[in-house]
Amino acid sequence: MNQVIENVDFDSYISSFRKHLYHLFREEFDYGSISLKRDFPAEFLAEIMKKKPLAVAIPKLHAGRGVSVKECLAVLSAASYESLALSLMFGINIALFLEPLAKYGNFSVQERVFKDFMENNAMGGLMITEKAYGSDALNMKTGYEHIGNSYKIKGEKHWQGLSGAANYWLVTARKYTTTGELTRDIDFFVTENGNPEQHIPMVERYNNL
């Protein structure tokens, strides 16, 4: 499947993906009822992801289609036509997790995470905003310290998408100095929610997108 997605002509792929979404949203499932709740049913989402739409934001080196802006936008457009909620889900994964990871992530992390996306339809989001500071990243209070071969992150994030659904998070934090102050620079960490040592507990969840 991955090899087919990687090499198939994109015009053929996106046409097939649009037809796939049309069939799922308008024929196979009752989207009118599904849309009344926040989350897509697991079976419904699994059917959507069979076409590997997030492959457009994964490098070819990792069996993706190569992180083409044109292809990413086409997938978002196809999703938007059937569901804004689906488009938002894809947009968060593509623009806020996959593209930054592809551009800045360590190769070993890329290899492991992208494989999970391609083989298991994993999802990822970004944790940057905080309830008291919004988008004022320079005032964020989430901090980290380097302990041996690992990092310890402490803080609370306020996020409005993919809460409870993401398998991975791109978390922003500022380094603690020896005096306990926070530096101005912001660093990014990839956490895996299925790993007990990296799991980020959810304090509150809202019934929205």
Where on the chain are the PLM-derived regions?
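N-terminal glycine-rich flavin-associated loop
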Residues: 62, 86-108, 127, 134-137, ...
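A short core secondary-structure module
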Residues: 156-202
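Buried hydrophobic positions in well-ordered alpha/beta secondary-structure cores of metabolic enzymes
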Residues: 75, 106, 153-155, 189
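Short acidic, glycine/serine/threonine-rich loops at helix termini
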Residues: 69, 101, 136-140, 163-166, ...
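A short, Trp-centered hydrophobic/proline-enriched beta-strand micro-motif
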Residues: 56, 119-129
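Glycine-rich beta->alpha junctions and the first turn(s) of the following alpha-helix
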Residues: 202-209
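A structural signal for short hydrophobic beta-strand segments in well-ordered beta-sheet cores
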Residues: 142-145
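Amphipathic, small/basic residue-rich leader segments at the start of a protein or domain
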Residues: 1-92, 112-116
